[in-house]
């Protein structure tokens, strides 16, 4: 299978039938579910007298609504308690594996599936969550779906999809010290726009991509959706195989060798034809911070908020809206903007290497006066690994709060929220109005290392100036 793109190969391998109107019935190899988008789907199955078609291909966890301070049951929020209880009942009834609180395997769905070895090259992955594209880091084709589609996959293990075009995003050279995959993807979205990927899958390729760790590749693919793409992926290589080897659900013994041989064949061939290609130079990318109300409104930390005349006319109305909402002026330097809350975590940047990068900044320093800073590991496994390295102690000594795993302040579905006009430095993926729990709260997206720098200084600060320039 040397010719063609990985996307084409995986699509063809999972095609069940061509449907009227041009869509395809696609088999889903792995279905991930959680407590928010699954209750209505299970209820719809029961109404129709249906059962889960392939419970062995369905895996559940709880992440969105869980508190990160105390996870003792019952939760203080009765709605959150009912959502978790409903998930527990549904999984028990249908024979679905649930990685619940205290299991040692609970965490954000897009963190636990890779770390358990569930996500593998050549798979189709679906989940009722926008950032399912994360799993494309392994050479999988992964789609975020809505509740009605969660119902369809539970009932049939397949999904009606329209085939996408493929855009290759080729990145030359290497990222500089202090610059991470988060900066790269924010730069890509800034350059192409939040709608440029509509109708596309993004293939991330080139020397800079090959040099990324698996965890940074997950960050990259996680935010492909923020650029409008339906999914994003990286071709599987030795980095992929080394990450998967020995994980709980990965193939082992002779099956491992067969799997690796097949996985290698899935990578896009040298003669693969792409519908479009865009090139970037990693060496020119600086630590990047969003200044506005979409992930596409980003600038290098050494830049100023763009003036209207510098923008495409189509982008000026939302820029004007962003100036007012964020209380930032055209031409204002982003460095030096004061922050109130600093959040490190999420499915974008809540993995061990993210915490290591932030801890390298925090070590020997202290959170600035008046700043609330907290770290939320992406999973129980991440938390235990970080604690084994002493990272929790580093953060606590620096004045950060060390929390239990969950989605936390990425979104306003749990107790971790902004208040009033607070402004956060956040390692999450969305800076929409009200995203972090306050209707007037403001969000600046950046890498975990940059969040740590903001926490230490009380303002947006170029992490490269703190003499702790590291990448993983």
From Swiss-Prot:
<keyword id="KW-0004">4Fe-4S</keyword>
<comment type="similarity">
    <text>Belongs to the aconitase/IPM isomerase family. LeuC type 1 subfamily.</text>
</comment>
<keyword id="KW-0432">Leucine biosynthesis</keyword>
<dbReference type="GO" id="GO:0051539">
    <property type="term" value="F:4 iron, 4 sulfur cluster binding"/>
</dbReference>
<dbReference type="InterPro" id="IPR033941">
    <property type="entry name" value="IPMI_cat"/>
</dbReference>
<keyword id="KW-0028">Amino-acid biosynthesis</keyword>
<keyword id="KW-0411">Iron-sulfur</keyword>
<dbReference type="InterPro" id="IPR001030">
    <property type="entry name" value="Acoase/IPM_deHydtase_lsu_aba"/>
</dbReference>
<protein>
    <recommendedName>
        <fullName>3-isopropylmalate dehydratase large subunit</fullName>
        <ecNumber>4.2.1.33</ecNumber>
    </recommendedName>
</protein>
<dbReference type="InterPro" id="IPR050067">
    <property type="entry name" value="IPM_dehydratase_rel_enz"/>
</dbReference>
<comment type="subunit">
    <text>Heterodimer of LeuC and LeuD.</text>
</comment>
<keyword id="KW-0456">Lyase</keyword>
<keyword id="KW-0100">Branched-chain amino acid biosynthesis</keyword>
<dbReference type="InterPro" id="IPR036008">
    <property type="entry name" value="Aconitase_4Fe-4S_dom"/>
</dbReference>
<dbReference type="InterPro" id="IPR004430">
    <property type="entry name" value="3-IsopropMal_deHydase_lsu"/>
</dbReference>
<dbReference type="Pfam" id="PF00330">
    <property type="entry name" value="Aconitase"/>
</dbReference>
<comment type="pathway">
    <text>Amino-acid biosynthesis; L-leucine biosynthesis; L-leucine from 3-methyl-2-oxobutanoate: step 2/4.</text>
</comment>
<comment type="function">
    <text>Catalyzes the isomerization between 2-isopropylmalate and 3-isopropylmalate, via the formation of 2-isopropylmaleate.</text>
</comment>
<dbReference type="GO" id="GO:0003861">
    <property type="term" value="F:3-isopropylmalate dehydratase activity"/>
</dbReference>
<feature type="binding site">
    <location>
        <position position="410"/>
    </location>
    <ligand>
        <name>[4Fe-4S] cluster</name>
    </ligand>
</feature>
<keyword id="KW-0479">Metal-binding</keyword>
<dbReference type="GO" id="GO:0046872">
    <property type="term" value="F:metal ion binding"/>
</dbReference>
<dbReference type="GO" id="GO:0009098">
    <property type="term" value="P:L-leucine biosynthetic process"/>
</dbReference>
<dbReference type="InterPro" id="IPR018136">
    <property type="entry name" value="Aconitase_4Fe-4S_BS"/>
</dbReference>
<dbReference type="InterPro" id="IPR015931">
    <property type="entry name" value="Acnase/IPM_dHydase_lsu_aba_1/3"/>
</dbReference>
<feature type="binding site">
    <location>
        <position position="407"/>
    </location>
    <ligand>
        <name>[4Fe-4S] cluster</name>
    </ligand>
</feature>
<feature type="binding site">
    <location>
        <position position="347"/>
    </location>
    <ligand>
        <name>[4Fe-4S] cluster</name>
    </ligand>
</feature>
<keyword id="KW-0408">Iron</keyword>
């Amino acid at each position: 299978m040397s010719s063609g793109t990985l996307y084409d190969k995986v699509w063809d391998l999972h095609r069940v039938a061509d449907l009227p109107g041009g869509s395809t019935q696609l088999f889903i190899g792995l279905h991930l579910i959680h407590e928010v988008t699954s209750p209505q789907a299970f209820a719809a199955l029961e109404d129709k007298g249906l059962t889960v078609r392939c419970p062995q291909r369905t895996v559940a966890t709880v992440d969105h609504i869980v508190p990160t301070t105390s996870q003792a049951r019952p939760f203080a929020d009765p709605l959150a308690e009912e959502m978790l209880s409903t998930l527990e009942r549904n999984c028990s009834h249908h024979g679905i594996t649930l990685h619940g609180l205290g299991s040692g395997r609970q965490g954000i769905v897009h963190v636990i599936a890779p770390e358990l070895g569930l996500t593998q090259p050549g798979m189709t992955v679906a989940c009722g969550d926008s950032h399912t594209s994360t799993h494309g880091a392994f050479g999988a084709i992964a789609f975020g779906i809505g509740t009605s589609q969660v119902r369809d996959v539970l009932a049939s293990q397949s999904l009606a999809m329209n085939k996408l075009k493929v855009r290759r995003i080729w990145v030359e050279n290497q990222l500089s010290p202090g610059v991470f995959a988060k900066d790269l993807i924010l730069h890509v979205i800034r350059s192409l726009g939040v709608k440029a990927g509509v109708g596309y899958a993004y293939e991330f390729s080139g020397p800079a991509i090959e040099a990324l760790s698996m965890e940074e590749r997950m960050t990259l693919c996680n935010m492909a959706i923020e650029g409008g793409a339906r999914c994003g992926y990286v071709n599987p290589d030795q980095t992929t195989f080394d990450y998967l080897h020995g994980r709980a659900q990965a193939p082992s013994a002779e099956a491992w060798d067969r799997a690796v041989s097949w996985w290698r064949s899935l990578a896009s061939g040298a003669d693969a034809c792409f519908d479009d290609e865009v090139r970037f130079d990693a060496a020119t990318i600086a630590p990047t911070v969003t200044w506005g109300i979409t992930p596409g409104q980003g600038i290098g930390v050494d830049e100023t908020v763009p003036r209207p005349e510098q923008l495409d006319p189509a982008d000026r109305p939302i820029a004007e809206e962003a100036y007012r909402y964020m209380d930032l002026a055209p031409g204002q330097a982003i460095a030096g903007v004061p922050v109130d809350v600093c959040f490190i975590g999420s499915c974008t940047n809540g993995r061990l290497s993210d915490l290591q990068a932030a801890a390298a900044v925090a070590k020997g320093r202290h959170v600035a006066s008046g700043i609330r800073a907290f770290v939320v590991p992406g999973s129980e496994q991440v938390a235990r690994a970080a604690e084994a390295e002493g990272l929790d102690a580093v953060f606590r000594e620096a004045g950060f709060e060390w929390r239990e795993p969950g989605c936390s302040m990425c979104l306003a579905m749990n107790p971790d929220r902004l208040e009033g006009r607070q402004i956060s430095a956040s390692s999450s993926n969305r800076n929409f109005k009200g995203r972090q729990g306050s209707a007037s709260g403001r969000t600046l997206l950046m890498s975990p290392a940059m969040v740590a720098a903001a926490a230490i200084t009380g303002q947006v600060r170029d992490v490269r100036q703190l003499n702790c320039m590291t990448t993983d």
